[in-house]
């Protein structure tokens, strides 16, 4: 029974070792696949990083162009609206002033009409120039809007590329997580193999205990054999003593037969007693012989059992030695595989940390680019506001200059007209004096 159990344990250990070899080959193949997959993922990450940098640069350029175009558009609209309002105000002011001047100078000389026509021509010329400038600005606005629409399309394409890159990054993170899960599963398998090795070591210890127990049983059987041999020797000695007594009795009986027949009755009685004793002794001898035979058979069985146990023990020792060697080899291989897997796991963890650092750097670079764009937009707004304020101040200065020049021109025109009126009045006075002198004559 113990031998069959040992054979069963031996076959189970062989099956476990074979399964462990298969798992080791499968694990090595899986590690090779994982390493190839990691290298391909690293190449893909480098390619995606390069594409992300290129798309980020294109997006930045497109965003800068779009912001610049929008700012130019807004500035042109503001300038055009401001110029249009100022021109309308100037036109209204000129019309009002013209009406006032026309009302005041209806009776004035033709020079006023000429000055008015000249002023109107100048105003019409200025209005025409303003209209041309407005049309040019509107055409420029249309072109800028077209450029803005094209830049919007480019920006949408860049955003789509960026979203695609983000999806690829998420997919790669999922793949890294799956690889981490696979590594955890490999670690669990490694722990299971270690537990199985511990179980095998425990079974080997149990086999050692069984071997000790069998040795104790063999020693007990040898002690019982020695005791039985001692009892058999004692019984043989007793049988020999009984045989000697029987011979002595027979000798006495023959001597008494020779000496006297009177003692026949006694001899018969003694003979009967002797026969009874002989029968008892024979019975005892037969019993002792049967016990001797049973003891001999038991001894033979014990010897055969001891020999078979010794052979089984030798086989078990050989199997145990082989299993121990195989277990040591498997343990060393398993340790080597565990160290290889640990190295692979550390490399994968380093790769994962490097990928995470690269993604974090890309994210930081994106945030820095966004901050730089925001700061550039704010600086551009401030610069544009300063330019607008400068242009506004220059325009107001030009308007004030034009107003002063216009006021000076009107004053000069009024002065000229007053001089002409004075000359006309003087001529009238002279003509009246001449008429009076002629009448007096």
From Swiss-Prot:
<keyword id="KW-0808">Transferase</keyword>
<dbReference type="GO" id="GO:0030036">
    <property type="term" value="P:actin cytoskeleton organization"/>
</dbReference>
<comment type="subunit">
    <text>Homodimer. Interacts with RHOA (activated by GTP), RHOB, RHOC, GEM, MYLC2B, RHOE, PPP1R12A, LIMK1, LIMK2, TSG101, CHORDC1, DAPK3, PFN1, PTEN and JIP3. Interacts with FHOD1 in a Src-dependent manner. Interacts with ITGB1BP1 (via N-terminus and PTB domain). Interacts with SHROOM3.</text>
</comment>
<feature type="coiled-coil region">
    <location>
        <begin position="1"/>
        <end position="99"/>
    </location>
</feature>
<dbReference type="GO" id="GO:0030866">
    <property type="term" value="P:cortical actin cytoskeleton organization"/>
</dbReference>
<comment type="similarity">
    <text>Belongs to the protein kinase superfamily. AGC Ser/Thr protein kinase family.</text>
</comment>
<dbReference type="GO" id="GO:0005524">
    <property type="term" value="F:ATP binding"/>
</dbReference>
<dbReference type="GO" id="GO:0051451">
    <property type="term" value="P:myoblast migration"/>
</dbReference>
<dbReference type="GO" id="GO:0005856">
    <property type="term" value="C:cytoskeleton"/>
</dbReference>
<keyword id="KW-0067">ATP-binding</keyword>
<dbReference type="GO" id="GO:0040038">
    <property type="term" value="P:polar body extrusion after meiotic divisions"/>
</dbReference>
<keyword id="KW-0175">Coiled coil</keyword>
<keyword id="KW-0966">Cell projection</keyword>
<dbReference type="GO" id="GO:0051894">
    <property type="term" value="P:positive regulation of focal adhesion assembly"/>
</dbReference>
<keyword id="KW-0963">Cytoplasm</keyword>
<dbReference type="GO" id="GO:1901888">
    <property type="term" value="P:regulation of cell junction assembly"/>
</dbReference>
<feature type="domain" description="RhoBD">
    <location>
        <begin position="356"/>
        <end position="422"/>
    </location>
</feature>
<dbReference type="GO" id="GO:0000139">
    <property type="term" value="C:Golgi membrane"/>
</dbReference>
<dbReference type="GO" id="GO:0000281">
    <property type="term" value="P:mitotic cytokinesis"/>
</dbReference>
<dbReference type="GO" id="GO:0048598">
    <property type="term" value="P:embryonic morphogenesis"/>
</dbReference>
<dbReference type="GO" id="GO:0030334">
    <property type="term" value="P:regulation of cell migration"/>
</dbReference>
<dbReference type="GO" id="GO:1903431">
    <property type="term" value="P:positive regulation of cell maturation"/>
</dbReference>
<dbReference type="GO" id="GO:0030027">
    <property type="term" value="C:lamellipodium"/>
</dbReference>
<dbReference type="Pfam" id="PF08912">
    <property type="entry name" value="Rho_Binding"/>
</dbReference>
<dbReference type="GO" id="GO:0106310">
    <property type="term" value="F:protein serine kinase activity"/>
</dbReference>
<dbReference type="GO" id="GO:0072518">
    <property type="term" value="F:Rho-dependent protein serine/threonine kinase activity"/>
</dbReference>
<dbReference type="GO" id="GO:0005886">
    <property type="term" value="C:plasma membrane"/>
</dbReference>
<dbReference type="GO" id="GO:0090521">
    <property type="term" value="P:podocyte cell migration"/>
</dbReference>
<keyword id="KW-0206">Cytoskeleton</keyword>
<dbReference type="GO" id="GO:0032059">
    <property type="term" value="C:bleb"/>
</dbReference>
<dbReference type="InterPro" id="IPR015008">
    <property type="entry name" value="ROCK_Rho-bd_dom"/>
</dbReference>
<keyword id="KW-0472">Membrane</keyword>
<dbReference type="GO" id="GO:0032956">
    <property type="term" value="P:regulation of actin cytoskeleton organization"/>
</dbReference>
<dbReference type="InterPro" id="IPR050839">
    <property type="entry name" value="Rho-assoc_Ser/Thr_Kinase"/>
</dbReference>
<feature type="coiled-coil region">
    <location>
        <begin position="418"/>
        <end position="441"/>
    </location>
</feature>
<keyword id="KW-1003">Cell membrane</keyword>
<dbReference type="GO" id="GO:0070507">
    <property type="term" value="P:regulation of microtubule cytoskeleton organization"/>
</dbReference>
<keyword id="KW-0723">Serine/threonine-protein kinase</keyword>
<dbReference type="GO" id="GO:0031267">
    <property type="term" value="F:small GTPase binding"/>
</dbReference>
<comment type="function">
    <text>Protein kinase which is a key regulator of the actin cytoskeleton and cell polarity. Involved in regulation of smooth muscle contraction, actin cytoskeleton organization, stress fiber and focal adhesion formation, neurite retraction, cell adhesion and motility via phosphorylation of DAPK3, GFAP, LIMK1, LIMK2, MYL9/MLC2, TPPP, PFN1 and PPP1R12A. Phosphorylates FHOD1 and acts synergistically with it to promote SRC-dependent non-apoptotic plasma membrane blebbing. Phosphorylates JIP3 and regulates the recruitment of JNK to JIP3 upon UVB-induced stress.</text>
</comment>
<dbReference type="GO" id="GO:0004674">
    <property type="term" value="F:protein serine/threonine kinase activity"/>
</dbReference>
<keyword id="KW-0547">Nucleotide-binding</keyword>
């Amino acid at each position: 029974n113990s031998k069959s159990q040992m054979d069963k344990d031996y076959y189970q250990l062989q099956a476990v070792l074979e399964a462990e070899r298969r798992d080791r080959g499968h694990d090595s193949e899986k590690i090779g696949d994982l390493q190839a997959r990691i290298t391909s993922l690293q190449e893909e990450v480098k390619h995606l990083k390069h594409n992300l940098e290129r798309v980020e640069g294109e997006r930045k350029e497109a965003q800068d162009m779009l912001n610049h175009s929008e700012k130019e558009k807004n500035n042109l609209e503001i300038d055009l609206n401001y110029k249009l309002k100022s021109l309308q105000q100037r036109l209204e002011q000129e019309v009002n002033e013209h009406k006032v001047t026309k009302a005041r100078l209806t009776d004035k000389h033709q020079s006023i009409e000429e000055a008015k026509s000249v002023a109107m021509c100048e105003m019409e010329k200025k209005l025409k120039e303003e209209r041309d400038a407005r049309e040019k600005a509107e055409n420029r606005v249309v072109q800028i809007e077209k450029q803005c629409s094209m830049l919007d399309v480019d920006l949408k394409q860049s955003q789509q590329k960026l979203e695609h890159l983000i999806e690829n990054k998420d997919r790669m993170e999922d793949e890294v997580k799956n690889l981490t899960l696979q590594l955890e599963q490999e670690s669990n398998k490694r722990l299971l193999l270690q537990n199985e090795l511990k179980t095998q070591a425990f079974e080997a210890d149990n086999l050692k205990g069984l071997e000790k127990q069998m040795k104790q049983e063999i020693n007990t059987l040898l002690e019982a054999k020695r005791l039985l041999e001692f009892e058999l020797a004692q019984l043989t000695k007793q049988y020999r003593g009984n045989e000697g007594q029987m011979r002595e009795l027979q000798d006495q009986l023959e001597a008494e037969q020779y000496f006297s027949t009177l003692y026949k009755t006694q001899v018969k009685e003694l003979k009967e007693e002797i026969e009874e004793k002989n029968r008892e002794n024979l019975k005892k001898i037969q019993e002792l012989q049967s016990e001797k035979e049973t003891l001999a058979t038991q001894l033979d069985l014990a010897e055969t059992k001891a020999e078979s146990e010794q052979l089984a023990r030798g086989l078990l020792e050989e199997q145990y030695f082989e299993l121990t060697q195989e277990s040591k080899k498997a343990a060393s291989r398993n340790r080597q595989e565990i160290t290889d897997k640990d190295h692979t796991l550390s490399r994968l963890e380093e790769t994962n940390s490097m990928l995470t650092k690269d993604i974090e750097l890309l994210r930081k670079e994106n945030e820095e680019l966004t901050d730089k764009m925001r700061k550039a937009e704010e600086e551009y707004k401030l610069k544009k506001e300063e330019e607008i304020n400068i242009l506004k101040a220059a325009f107001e200065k030009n308007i004030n200059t034009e107003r002063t020049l216009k006021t000076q021109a009107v004053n000069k025109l009024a002065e000229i007209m007053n001089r002409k009126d004075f000359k006309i009045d003087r001529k009238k006075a002279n003509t009246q004096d001449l008429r009076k002198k002629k009448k007096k004559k």
